[in-house]
Amino acid sequence: MQQLQNVIESAFERRADITPANVDTVTREAVNQVISLLDSGALRVAEKIDGQWVTHQWLKKAVLLSFRINDNQVIDGAESRYFDKVPMKFADYDEARFVKEGFRVVPPAAVRQGAFIARNTVLMPSYVNIGAYVDEGSMVDTWATVGSCAQIGKNVHLSGGVGIGGVLEPLQANPTIIEDNCFIGARSEVVEGVIVEEGSVISMGVYIGQSTRIYDRETGEVHYGRVPAGSVVVSGNLPSKDGKYSLYCAVIVKKVDAKTRSKVGINELLRTID
């Protein structure tokens, strides 16, 4: 694996000079191998090690290199044709392979090659970009988008129209991460490498980036870039220092544990916020 990483790191340093026409065989094979390993879930761009999320930057570099070494090509779809550098993940799947891998894909959901989809996942008409990882038992609902290299945990529900930000455009240092057992409400956006920790519930229409203030109304604490585990979050506003105007924020209205979540439905958690 170290040898593979070394090839990727070396190629990335000279990426400006690499084209589909002049890329060397060693680099092409290394990039293709990484994309295949990401696609199968054998590798992932970020993983939790000793309780901390670690981003493997060299894997992200391999994803970026894949755009340098490949020409656009025609991609056939059921209702149309497309023209892109990245093949679709399910282009060569037959019924037996879908059954073996154990997830459902509802048309016209689109998943790029290099994204991993785990067992018991349901993809409604949605989009999952290259390098993303969607873990077991999760639902990517209609018109939701999982951005490049984003990490989605087990038993996560991404509601209709949710946007989970990617790292490639614009280039971000770390992927956006939604940990296990989270619920992200309709039309919410989580971007710029924000981490939503385990068991959190994000209400409809909440927008969280690195500069968004995440205000805990019980403690008065303000978080940036991280939603603490077990938080129930709604959109809100905080006053300016001079009191003349207010600015958008996300508000943690309560904290819940796994026991409470198992007994209380998501809708009830969001409706009883006073």
UniProtKB/Swiss-Prot annotation:
Gene3D superfamilies, alphabetically?
Hexapeptide repeat proteins, Tetrahydrodipicolinate-N-succinyltransferase, N-terminal domain
| One GO CC term on file | cytoplasm
Which GO molecular function annotation, any one, does this entry have?
A: 2,3,4,5-tetrahydropyridine-2,6-dicarboxylate N-succinyltransferase activity
UniProtKB keywords: Acyltransferase, Amino-acid biosynthesis, Cytoplasm, Diaminopimelate biosynthesis, Lysine biosynthesis, Repeat, Transferase
Q: State whether it acts alone or in a complex, and with which partners, per the record.
A: Homotrimer.
Q: What is the lineage of its organism?
A: Bacteria, Pseudomonadati, Pseudomonadota, Gammaproteobacteria, Enterobacterales
Which PROSITE patterns is this protein grouped with? HEXAPEP_TRANSFERASES (PS00101)
The protein's name: 2,3,4,5-tetrahydropyridine-2,6-dicarboxylate N-succinyltransferase
Q: Which domain of life is it from?
A: Bacteria
Q: Which residues bind substrate?
A: 104, 141
- Species source reads Enterobacter sp. (strain 638)
EC number(s): the record gives 2.3.1.117
Recorded name of the encoding gene: dapD
Q: Name one GO biological process term.
A: lysine biosynthetic process via diaminopimelate
